[in-house]
């Protein structure tokens, strides 16, 4: 069973990770807009999609921790 302290620590880490991923998604969006190479743009898009999926999973984890 997870203690309240452990839950709080996990929540703090998830929130920090969420913020970091949000920034990376924004960075990739900017790169995607200025990229002139189609292959590079496709790789950037794919990376952004993977980060969005990770972000959604983190949000679900936060919701689960909050009950």
Describe the residue ranges of each PLM region.
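Short, charge-rich amphipathic interface segments used for partner binding and complex assembly
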Residues: 16-67
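Short, charge/polar-rich alpha-helical segments
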Residues: 1-22
